[in-house]
Amino acid sequence: MLKTKLLSRYYFGSLDEKAAYKVYCLEKNAKHLLEARELKVKWKPTDNTKPVAVMKRVLATNQLVLAIKSKCSSYKSDIIKKVLVADKENELKANAFITLAQGITKIDVAVEAIRREKNWEEKLLARLNLYKNFFDTFKPGTEGMNEKPYILFVCEDKKHMAEVYKVMVMNNIDLEGRVYFTYDLLQMEPSLENTWHQFIHEDQKIKLQPLNIELLK
C-alpha cells in the first residue's frame, strides 16, 4: 500500500529516545479510491505535514473515538473538529464531538486531547478561556446544541490529568463541573465505564475520583 500511494508512513522519535513509533496516514490514491465508493473524505495533502504535536493530538482523539464506537452501546455519533463557536475572533472547534444516548439519557461530549508539547500550559489556558467564553455565552440552539456539552480532556497519563487540572485551578477557570478527564492507556481497557475521572474537593484536599458511567458500558 505504500508503493501504490494508498498510505504513507512516518516515524515519531527524538535523539534522547531509545524507541520510535510508526504512523500511517492516508495518501491521495486512497482518497480517490474511497471517493469512488461514494465515501466522504476530508483528507488533504497538508494533513500529512502538520507539526508532530498536532498529529499526536489527532492520534489520541482518534483512539478515544474508536474505543467508544467499538465498546459502548450508547454511542450515537461523532463529529471531528465540531464547530462550537463560529465567531472568527473566538472560533472554537472541539477535537471531536461525541453523542452518547441510552433511553431518555443523552449527553454530548467535546473532546480535547492535550499533549505535553512546548508551552503546552499556555496553549491549554488559551483553549480553556475559549471554552469559558463558550459556556458564558451559550444559548440553546447554538450550533445545533440544546444543552452545554461536557468536556473530556484526553491526557497523556495519570499525572498529566493533575497537571491539566492545576492549570484550571490556578487560573480560576470554572466550567460548571462539566469536565471529565481520561488518558491514553485507559482506552485499551475492555470496558470504558470506569475510565473517566473528576477532581473533587473533600476535607480541604483535592482528590481524583474515577466515575462509574452507565453510558460507557
Residue ranges of predicted features:
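Nuclease-adjacent, charged terminal/linker segments that flank catalytic cores
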Residues: 1-48
